[in-house]
Amino acid sequence: MDQNPLYEVVGDVSDVPTGLHLVAGLTGFTDSGSAVGQITELLRGLPVVRDLVVFDNDALLDYRARRPVMFFDEDHLSSYEPARLVLSLVEDELHRPFLLLTGYEPDFRWEAFTRAVMELIERFGVADTTWINAIPMPTPHTRPIGVTVSGNRPELVEAFSIWRPRTQVPGNALHLLEYRLQEAGHPTAGFVLLVPHYLADTEYPLAAVAALESISAATGLIFPTDELREEGRDFTQKVEEQVAGNTELERLVRTLEERHDSYMEENPLPSPLVDQDGELPSADTIAAELERFLASRRDEPRP
């Protein structure tokens, strides 16, 4: 395998089977509900994880924007934890291998990074590529998390994409990868989760569940979600307790529900996210009332 200056191959990769799915999720862009962060932690915590390729931080990372962690031990620096952008070989719950691209979104050289990933896709004979992102939307937490699907797999768009706007969006590195893969005719799908925007700054377990379900729909891979679902039930119960104690909150959530349901029933409204005048509903009151709950949850130690 010819060496590319943007990455280093870790050991012998000649035994990596061809025809695997590639799953990608990068942090640094919008990650509402910490969906990408949570699934990265879960997938890299699976029993079988083997790093194949490590990308060069000095070429791709802005250290001053995302400073690495240094560990200070009384009177000296004891260790250094740099960011990592890595392609790994992982196994799902049924011990089926797949490729996983995780880490930071490159700050620099997006075209070169895209070419490098496409080179790896060709080298490993990847069958298809699926990537995940999550953005905030004024949708209610009482309804299933919706997704917008992009790419060149129309069966996934038709089955799962509930919002299909014509608009300009701020691009990310995986958008560019998808665009180039489409040009090359490689099967690719991007799933953008529509997370309730008043929960966007939390670690929302059901966002991670929705992300894993999307990956499963695109690839057939199976992942452990029982713990996340249980955390999601506890999280939702706490949110419901906050909402139930405030009439204004109840009214605002009900309004979001009505807009969502009208859209899902093919109401002529152009989107569940706007009213008939095209204005986004305000969630300031929701955010203010939930602030205490969200802050307290962030401070809770994780088991």
Describe the function of each predicted region.
Residues 138-218, 222:
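Catalytic cores of processing enzymes, dominated by hydrolases/peptidases
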Residues 24-25, 102-103, 131-133, 192-194:
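Short beta-strand segments
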Residues 18, 31-34, 38, 108, ...:
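Conserved active-site and cofactor/substrate-binding residues in soluble primary-metabolism enzymes
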